[in-house]
Regions:
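N-terminal "cap/leader" segments of large eukaryotic alpha-helical scaffolds
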Residues: 2-59, 93, 354-356
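Alpha-helical scaffold repeats of the Armadillo/HEAT/TPR superfamily
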Residues: 23-28, 64-72, 106-115, 148-156, ...
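Short helix-loop boundary/capping segments at the starts of domains
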Residues: 37, 52-62, 69, 74-81, ...
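Alpha-helical solenoid repeats of the armadillo/HEAT superfamily
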Residues: 38-52, 80-96, 107, 120-139, ...
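Recurring C-terminal helix/loop segment of individual leucine-rich repeat
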Residues: 61, 103, 143-146, 184-187, ...
Length: 357
């Protein structure tokens, strides 16, 4: 019986819009080319694949080396369709998590390239991903924050923060905060009215906005003249009210900002207002000493050490039945490294409260 050999059917070509991964060194160049495709379906599918690939450091390096960041910049700033812009912005956020890809973002001037989209794109998701990408970039090596400042973000963010949608206001403020470690960024934010913007947003109905505004205000008050400006704008009263905020993040931020502004003599004097406050600020500070949050108790100890310089405040702290026992409890913590740091600041606070002229 003759042997019958059946021909093996050829494998069908995959659809043009289906993204098939390459291997080794071809992975990055192939995907980068597909991300730049003119066909919308191919481009969107490639961007989706890129967002997944960026979680792998090796694949992220390959894509960055293939020049994908420049393509993403172009899509975010000039993409005609919303899915392309959203996915490209999301991919930039993934790039910012990787050291080599983040370096490529700085080299490609990403902050300047996407500024218009970051602040003004009609799609909220585009703005959200752009904020997240730049916050990560600004939180890394100094080159990242410097590139954001050089692109003019401090002034633009001060102007944008109050106008931004409430859901994105915390991101706008956090991005502004990331610029404040740069001397030029701090100066530009102050010149643009950053103090007034932060004080205004401390009154927001959203806890996340209040917390972000407090963090930003604390960063702005690194500058001595900014402390004076904040004090003159009634920052002490506003921040004292927030010490009893139901949100932990807002209490943390308010306490940190108060530590900054009460380093000045006028800030200390404002702790004793001419007219009594609706709620006693010193009592609120003492209550923070008993919080279970180590960051908050450490900051509260710093605040006690600052304000205890004022004789009236020092007397009130000393006479309060809960103040010194709360400080002693922090000094005698369980003994972890974190507790040791809290105890160190608690000892300083206790010395300030018990100081006699």
């Amino acid at each position: 019986m003759p042997l019958i050999v059946k021909p093996t059917p050829a494998h069908p070509e995959p659809p043009a819009h289906k993204i098939m991964p390459a291997f080794a060194t071809r992975f990055g160049p192939k995907l980068a080319g597909e991300v730049a495709a003119t066909d919308r379906l191919v481009r969107v599918n490639a961007l989706t694949a890129l967002c997944d690939a960026l979680s792998d450091p090796e694949q992220a390096h390959g894509c960055a080396d293939a020049g994908v960041v420049e393509t993403l910049n172009a899509h975010v700033s000039g993409g005609q369709d919303a899915p392309t812009r959203v996915l490209a912005a999301k991919a930039l956020c993934g790039c910012a998590r990787d050291a080599r890809a983040a370096r490529a973002m700085v080299d490609a001037a990403t902050p300047a390239a996407i500024q218009g989209a970051c602040l003004n794109d009609a799609e909220q998701d585009v703005r959200m991903h752009c904020y997240d990408a730049l916050i990560r970039l600004g939180g890394g090596p100094r080159r990242g924050a410097s590139s954001i400042v050089a692109a003019g973000y401090p002034k633009a963010l001060v102007e944008k923060a109050e106008k931004e949608s409430v859901g994105l206001q915390p991101r706008a403020l956090d991005l502004l905060t990331s610029c404040l470690g740069n001397e030029q960024g701090l100066a530009e934010a102050l010149d643009a009215g950053g103090i007034a913007t932060c004080l205004s947003l401390l009154g927001s109905m959203e806890a996340a906005v209040r917390a972000a505004a407090g963090r930003c205000l604390a960063g702005l008050c690194f500058d001595v003249s900014a402390k004076d400006a904040a004090v003159e704008a009634d920052a002490v009263d506003i921040l004292c009210a927030l010490l009893e905020d139901p949100d932990l993040g807002a209490r943390r931020a308010a306490c940190a900002a108060l530590v900054s502004v009460t380093t000045t003599d006028e800030g200390k004097r404002r702790m004793v207002p001419a007219e009594p406050r609706p709620r006693d600020a010193v009592a609120a500070i003492i209550a923070l000493l008993a919080e279970p949050d180590a960051y908050l108790t450490t900051t509260a100890c710093k605040l006690v050490a600052n304000v205890a310089v004022h004789p009236k405040v020092r007397a009130q702290l000393r006479e309060d039945k809960e103040c010194l026992p709360a400080i002693d409890a922090l000094i005698a913590g369980p003994g972890t490294d974190q507790d040791a740091l809290v105890a160190q600041h608690a000892r300083i606070a206790k010395d300030a409260v018990l100081w006699e002229p």
